[in-house]
Amino acid sequence: MMFWTRLGSSVVLVVLALIFLISGGPVLGAVCLLLSLTAYYELIKACHVEKDGKFTLLEIMGGCGIVLYGAAMMLSKNFLWGIGAIVLMFLAVMFVYVFHFPKYHADQVMTVFFCAFYPGVLFPFIYLTRELSWGKYLVWLIFISSWICDTCAYLTGMAIGKHKLAPVLSPKKSIEGAIGGVVGSALVGALFAWLFLIPETGSDAMIWVVALISAAGAVISQVGDLSASAIKRNHDIKDYGKIIPGHGGIMDRFDSVLFTAPVIYFLSVILLGAVH
């Protein structure tokens, strides 16, 4: 039963991804902002910052910071405005901390800032990548480097996995699986470039550069996966939420995507010369 639930959710996710990534623009920006806020809520709950299921003023300031950063990046696509939004969020959180002292402890302040920064800053890179030149194609590399990597790593690990990658944190993951995930992502990325980017740009070199970008993204995606797992282990929870049947929460499904998105964005800018 769980298999079919997970499969059904996966199909729905793929369909929604197709709709929103093809749409791009304000639609995708709004979706990224919604994902950021949902993931923020999941992290706040996981880290036990909220009390009695109610948001405090401190957490509300973190949420406002996410909205401010998302709006700044959508409207300007300028990292200077983004940095300004992050600074304002920090100042707002500290303002609440100082003028409500000793209601909040320092570790609560740092946790709120972390929970807001993690999804709030990383999710918008999906939107920013979509807005690059060739962005309607490049944005898919984020998911090739995360979800394809995850699938290839799982299949490779099942077939030949012997050496543990992170035995304490994730006993089922193997070094062989991790390598298989990277290789699989590189191959799928190369195929994707051959089918879409070479006809679009006329450059045969795209196949090699995109394979490299996909491989780099796949390496980082596995760090993202393990990072989210570490937080769950620290707080003794199985899943971040139940919003996606069979998968858990937004953080459970997008943990690797969050780390991959900025890597794909910056490598696309640096190696491919993509611009807004």
Q: Where does each model-flagged region fall?
A:
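Hydrophobic transmembrane alpha-helical segments of multi-pass transport and channel proteins
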Residues: 215-223, 250-258
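Short helical (or helix-break) motifs at transmembrane helix termini and adjacent helical loops
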Residues: 147-158, 221-233
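Hydrophobic alpha-helical transmembrane segments that constitute the membrane-spanning cores
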Residues: 188, 192, 263-268
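Hydrophobic transmembrane alpha-helices of multi-pass small-molecule transporters
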Residues: 185-186, 253, 260, 269
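Membrane-embedded alpha-helical bundles of polytopic integral membrane proteins
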Residues: 1-215
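Juxtamembrane boundary at the C-terminal end of a transmembrane helix
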Residues: 266-276
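Transmembrane alpha-helical segments of integral membrane proteins
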Residues: 95, 194, 223-239
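Interfacial loop-to-transmembrane junctions
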Residues: 233-256
